[in-house]
Amino acid sequence: MALTCRMRIPIPGYRGRPRRRKGLTGNGRFRRRSMRRRMKGGVLPFLIPLIAAAIGAVPGIASVALQASRKN
């Protein structure tokens, strides 16, 4: 990848920004164990974002239903 200035002239020898590799930091055993760890707080913290998203989607769903009923 060449670095380009505003006039799109490639600058030789520039390879771009170093990209971060995800998931390679830390110990693999620790990562696996942390994924299996039981969620703190039970099911409620998991459900709250889903309920909030459903409540936010209600007006959009209702408007689509109203438009569909008006066309028929």
Curated annotation (Swiss-Prot):
Residues 2-27, 43-72 form a propeptide. The record marks N27, G28, G42, V43 as: Cleavage. It comes from the Viruses. GO terms for molecular function: DNA binding. InterPro entries: Adenovirus_late_L2_mu_core. The keyword DNA-binding applies. Keywords: DNA-binding, Late protein, Virion. It is found in: Virion. Belongs to the adenoviridae pX family. This is Late L2 mu core protein. The gene is PX.
